[in-house]
């Protein structure tokens, strides 16, 4: 209840009464902040054309001050002639009649406070001043409209001057008569921006235009939206991974080829499109070639679908003949001549591949431009380099030259940069200053930069190729093709006569290949074959590619997918393969996600899988910075790179959740590119949604956290974030910024990274990535997941390493036997197909290699009779890696260390043993020698049971979810949480087992003479207790007995193999007391089938069995000590330790 109104309160109100109209006019001050705030509250609301605090609002006040000065000047002149005119009046413009109101030329209404019916906003505003302000606002809108129409007229003149403008009607007419049209145009003809607009003007409303790169989708959508007068994100939009401006009103959408293929995967007939434009088909990207094959099959079933193939004038007949001699509309390119200057560089025989690129030839070009062309002549320089390392080398030297001359702004351009840094190349240099853009081949066709007059062509390009024999990705530098050289030359001369400097001889150009090698002929085809299988396009070997890939590459990919379990023996998709095809990642990363969904490790696996699917977030410059290394050291994990990335992401999320901390500065201090972390967050969310869609993860419930006030605050924050995003998008394409003379480059950090927190209303200072992140993600959920992940127990960490190890298998590397005596930088590792690999410089083990061999110092405590390379230890390790990349050396990328023996027993696809199982060979190249044969047999038997149970549980889970999705009657029993918990405990117990063994890589000669070969075997052993229900049969090539599809028993050559299966010693069963001569295998088989041995009982006994499993080890066995006369249950290690006590 409100308090009673006292006389004192009334007197106070009278004292502070509102001023009268006359008093308000006398005290009125247009520059007063409170006055401006009241006017903004009245006129610049959320629903108005100009919003309070926006960039447009700031522009209005600048205009208003100029208008006021102009009107005051005219008023003072008129007062001399007409002294009776009011002082503070703002009259109409001199060249307009007083009765004219410019609002009739403006397609919107400007309402005042009284018209709005607002209470309180306008009560302190005099009506006369409100009318004056309203008139000034109308003048501003009229002025802005005149400016817009002036820009529009200029834009239309520029469009009409493009070479393709004369061919617009011809393209539309040809498309009307044919289903497929090839539009071939040289660089700069305008095909990418104009053809979609011609279709829009012709009445097509569902147009998709594919681009090979994301940056091209964004830049073209902005340009076409600006030229077509479409509001950004409405009629014209783009759709790329994690980001989309597409809406229900969108008529033209620019999207990546991979995204369109995903849409075809969901809806094979593509009913949502009338016209498909496939741009840059001449680049021959992998997915582009596949898309052309899909469209060739689709078009007969969709006669209403039109397809336009847009290409440079390169091998046009190939595309035309592929689509039944489709008509070609050829458009001329540039209008201005281009002078080609050949500047071959002298060969330097002493230069090695590891040395940096010499930047001096590029600096000489800059000097020649400065001397020959005056700064008043506009024209920027575009330099084509082969890769990021070459860009960094030239960037450093060019920035030094630019700081000395003050005539250049040097900018890098490559796909690893953030969008903000990529957009800088479209900004304008200051007067008298030129831009020098150092680019990879991304600027060859995908990005068009206005104002380029000079081009420097290094003649080199780096391309990724796949070596199926060594199973590695090889990034190599090649000479470009003649077609690429012409494309690069064409970037000059778009706006005037241009110059192309070629840093090679004309004879080199004549020796170039005519066209680049199609990507489908030089990369791994695993993901493509998997996608083809999921789209049911038939046998990949017979698919109608425009140019088929090498048959060996297809066979390698199919064999790899069969090994990974994605395809069965008949090359049909397995349940895990169907799910892997839905995940936009490599097969090994997809396997991690599926395996992690079985256990209670979904959150850490999601983060690690996302981190391994993007480029490394660590900047190149930070690798040589001691300060960055010291700041990043607490985040490094001695378990491997995936766990370091895991720690980095979790720590970044914690920083994000604290309002008082700046995540950009946090990342810069540690040498981390923040936009890579944004990509991880987006990818993590996508993975989570995919697992939820397939029933492998329970959907998150949208919980209402906090009281009503907290929820109101959250809604207000989201509303403010939406407003910031809208302001940024509205202001993004209006005008280009003027670059500074010294544009800092720090591995992709944008201008916002260098600034502190921006004021809420300043759109120029908005970290738009942060805004999008907070709108797209539930920060509280991410923070809770990060907090829980930081407290992973020892058991969870071991289980997580098992999941990673199985997902990455068979990508293993074994350390060289002499690594412990090498320097840190000289650590060598060997894979099955590649010897002499080294750790990537960004690998956490590259700086701490002692972690990899310090564990094996335990071996020095064992008997020294064996060779150093055959040391016995229970802590041998292998490196599991995500990729093997060869540049100047073969590098292991993103490594994690895993226990060698347990991992090989659980994951190897080929496991061969000798007679007593003390010698094992995994996958035909890694030999394990175990000290105790009985322990070896027990461990082998345990691994067989665990493998079978794990595989069965995974198949049942995937089959159960598939039946649920198809709403079929469930035939498979779902995996219970209790069963998963039991399996987890037994896997952990298995990995914790300790048994001395040696590990070494077999030589080629040893591999050739490894097997006993087929032979006459007198009798097949019957060992149901050891190998379960497996039927043993002689192996036709290796010899010995084939137990399972991966295990072959007693096939390895050994001096004692001929007699090992008949050597028996007396043994007493600890359960039933049986005393008989048995071989080691027969002993284990009897123990596993002994009627008096503990067996799996009813559910009530399961907990007791689990407790026993936790307290004892599968390697423990009865041991009678002769020295002390006592009986024990010891592992072999414990036996040795006990014996030493009596020495």
UniProtKB/Swiss-Prot annotation:
Catalytic activity: ATP + H2O = ADP + phosphate + H(+)
Region Required for phosphorylation of UPF1. Not required for interaction with UPF1, residue ranges: 810-1143
Protein name: Probable ATP-dependent RNA helicase DHX34
Lineage: Eukaryota, Metazoa, Chordata, Craniata, Vertebrata
Domain (Helicase ATP-binding): residue spans on this chain: 172-332
Class in the EC hierarchy, top level: hydrolase
Region (Disordered): 1-24, 75-94, 724-766
Species, as recorded: Homo sapiens
Gene Ontology cellular component terms for the protein in this record: membrane
Tissue: Expressed in whole blood, testis and spleen. Also expressed in the brain.
Pfam families hit by this protein: DEAD, HA2_C, HA2_N, Helicase_C, OB_NTP_bind, zf-C2H2_DHX34
Region (Required for the interaction with SMG1 and subsequent phosphorylation of UPF1): 957-1143
């Amino acid at each position: 209840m409100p308090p009673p109104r006292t006389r004192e309160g009334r007197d106070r109100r009278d004292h502070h009464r509102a001023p009268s109209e006359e008093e308000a006019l006398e005290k009125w001050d247009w520059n007063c902040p409170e006055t401006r705030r009241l006017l903004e509250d009245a006129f610049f609301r959320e629903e108005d054309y100009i919003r309070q605090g926006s960039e447009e609002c700031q522009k209005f006040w600048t205009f208003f001050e100029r208008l006021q000065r102009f009107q005051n000047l005219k008023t003072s002149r008129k007062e001399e002639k007409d002294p009776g005119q009011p002082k503070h009046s703002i009259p109409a413009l001199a060249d307009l009649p007083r009765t004219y109101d410019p609002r009739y030329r403006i397609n919107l209404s400007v309402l005042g406070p009284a018209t709005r019916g607002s209470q309180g906003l306008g009560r302190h505003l005099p009506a006369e001043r409100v009318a004056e302000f309203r008139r000034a606002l109308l003048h501003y809108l009229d002025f802005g409209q005149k400016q817009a129409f002036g820009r529009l007229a200029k834009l239309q003149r520029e469009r009409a001057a493009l070479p393709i403008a004369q061919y617009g009607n011809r393209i539309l007419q040809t498309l009307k008569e044919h289903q497929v049209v090839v539009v071939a145009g040289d660089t700069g003809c305008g095909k990418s921006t104009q053809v979609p607009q011609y279709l829009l003007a012709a009445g097509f409303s569902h147009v998709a235009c594919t681009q090979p790169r994301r940056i091209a989708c964004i830049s073209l959508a902005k340009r076409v939206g600006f030229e077509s007068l479409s509001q950004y994100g409405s009629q014209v939009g783009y759709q790329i991974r994690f980001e989309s401006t597409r809406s229900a009103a969108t008529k033209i959408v620019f999207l990546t080829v991979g995204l369109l293929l995903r849409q075809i995967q969901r809806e094979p007939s593509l009913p949502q499109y009338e016209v498909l434009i496939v741009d840059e088909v001449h680049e021959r990207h992998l997915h582009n070639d596949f898309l052309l094959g899909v469209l060739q099959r689709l078009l007969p079933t969709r006669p209403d679908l039109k397809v336009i193939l847009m290409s440079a004038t390169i091998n046009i007949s190939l595309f035309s003949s592929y689509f039944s001699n489709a008509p070609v509309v050829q458009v001329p390119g540039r209008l201005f001549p281009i002078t080609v200057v050949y500047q071959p560089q002298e060969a330097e025989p002493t230069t090695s591949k590891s040395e940096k690129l010499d930047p001096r030839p590029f600096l000489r070009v800059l000097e020649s431009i400065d001397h020959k062309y005056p700064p008043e002549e506009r024209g920027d320089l575009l330099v084509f380099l082969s890769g990021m390392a070459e860009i960094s080398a030239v960037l450093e030297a060019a920035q030094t030259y630019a700081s000395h001359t003050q005539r250049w702004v040097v900018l890098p351009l490559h796909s690893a940069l953030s969008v903000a840094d990529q957009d800088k190349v479209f900004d304008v240099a200051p007067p008298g200053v030129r831009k020098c853009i150092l680019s990879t081949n991304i600027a060859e066709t995908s990005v068009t930069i206005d104002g380029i007059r000079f081009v420097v062509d290094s003649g080199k390009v780096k391309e990724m190729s796949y070596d199926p024999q060594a199973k590695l990705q090889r990034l190599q530098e090649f000479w470009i093709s003649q077609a690429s050289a012409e494309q690069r030359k064409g970037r000059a001369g778009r706006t005037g006569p241009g110059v192309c400097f070629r840093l090679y001889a004309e004879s080199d150009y004549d020796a170039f290949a005519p066209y680049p090698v199609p990507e489908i002929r030089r990369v791994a085809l695993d993901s493509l074959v998997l996608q083809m299988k999921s789209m049911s396009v038939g046998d990949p070997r017979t698919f109608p590619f425009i140019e088929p890939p090498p048959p060996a590459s297809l066979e390698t990919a199919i064999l790899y997918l069969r090994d990974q379990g994605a395809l069965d023996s008949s090359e049909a998709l397995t349940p895990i393969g169907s799910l892997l095809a839905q995940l936009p990642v490599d097969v090994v990363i997809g396997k991690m996600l599926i395996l992690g969904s079985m256990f209670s490790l979904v959150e850490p696996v999601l983060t690690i899988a996302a981190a391994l699917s993007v480029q490394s977030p660590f900047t190149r410059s930070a690798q040589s910075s001691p300060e960055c290394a010291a700041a990043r050291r607490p985040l490094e994990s001695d378990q491997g790179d995936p766990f370091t990335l895991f720690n980095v992401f979790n720590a970044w999320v914690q920083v994000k959740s604290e309002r008082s901390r700046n995540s950009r500065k946090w990342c810069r201090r540690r040498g981390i590119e923040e936009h890579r972390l944004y990509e991880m967050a987006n990818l993590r969310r996508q993975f989570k949604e995919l697992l939820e869609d397939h029933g492998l993860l329970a959907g998150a419930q949208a919980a209402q956290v906090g009281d009503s006030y907290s929820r109101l605050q959250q809604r207000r924050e989201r509303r403010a974030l939406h407003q910031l995003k809208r302001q940024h998008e509205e202001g993004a394409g209006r005008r280009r910024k003027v670059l500074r003379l010294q544009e800092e480059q720090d591995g992709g950090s944008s201008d916002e990274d260098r600034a502190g927190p921006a004021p809420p209303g300043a759109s120029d200072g908005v970290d738009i990535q942060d805004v999008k992140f907070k709108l797209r993600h539930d920060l509280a959920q991410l923070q809770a997941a990060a907090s829980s992940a930081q407290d992973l127990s020892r058991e969870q960490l071991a289980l997580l390493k098992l999941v990673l190890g199985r997902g990455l298998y068979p990508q293993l590397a074994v350390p060289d036997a002499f690594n412990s005596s090498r320097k840190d930088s000289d650590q060598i590792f060997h894979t099955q197909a590649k010897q002499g690999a080294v750790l990537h410089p960004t690998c956490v083990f590259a700086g701490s290699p002692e972690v990899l061999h310090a564990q094996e110092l335990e071996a020095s405590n064992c008997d020294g009779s064996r060779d150093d390379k055959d040391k016995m230890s229970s802590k041998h390790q292998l490196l599991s890696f995500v990729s093997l990349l060869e540049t100047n050396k073969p590098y292991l990328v993103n490594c994690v260390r895993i226990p060698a023996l347990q991992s090989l027993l659980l994951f190897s696809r080929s496991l061969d043993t000798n007679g007593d199982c003390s010698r094992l060979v995994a996958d035909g190249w890694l030999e394990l020698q175990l000290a105790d044969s009985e322990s070896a047999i027990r461990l082998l038997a345990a691994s067989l049971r665990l493998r079978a149970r794990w595989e069965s549980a995974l198949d049942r889970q995937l089959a159960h979810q598939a039946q649920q999705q198809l709403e079929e009657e469930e035939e498979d029993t779902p995996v219970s949480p209790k069963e998963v918990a039991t399996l987890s405990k037994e896997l952990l117990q298995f990995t914790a087992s300790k048994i001395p063994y040696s590990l070494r890589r077999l030589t080629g000669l040893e591999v050739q003479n490894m097997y006993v070969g087929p032979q006459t075997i007198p009798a097949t052993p019957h060992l149901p207790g050891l190998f379960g229900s497996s039927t043993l049969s002689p192996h036709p090539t290796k010899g010995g007995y084939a137990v399972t599809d991966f295990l072959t028993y007693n096939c390895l050559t050994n001096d004692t193999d001929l007699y090992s299966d008949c050597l028996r010693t007396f043994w007493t069963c600890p359960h039933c007391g049986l005393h008989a001569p048995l071989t080691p295998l027969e002993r284990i088989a009897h123990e596993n089938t002994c009627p008096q041995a503990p067996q799996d009982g009813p559910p009530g006994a399961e907990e007791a069995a689990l407790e026993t499993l936790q307290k004892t080890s599968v390697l423990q066995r009865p041991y009678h000590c002769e020295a002390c006369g006592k009986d024990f249950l010891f592992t072999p290690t414990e036996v040795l330790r006990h014996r030493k006590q009596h020495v």
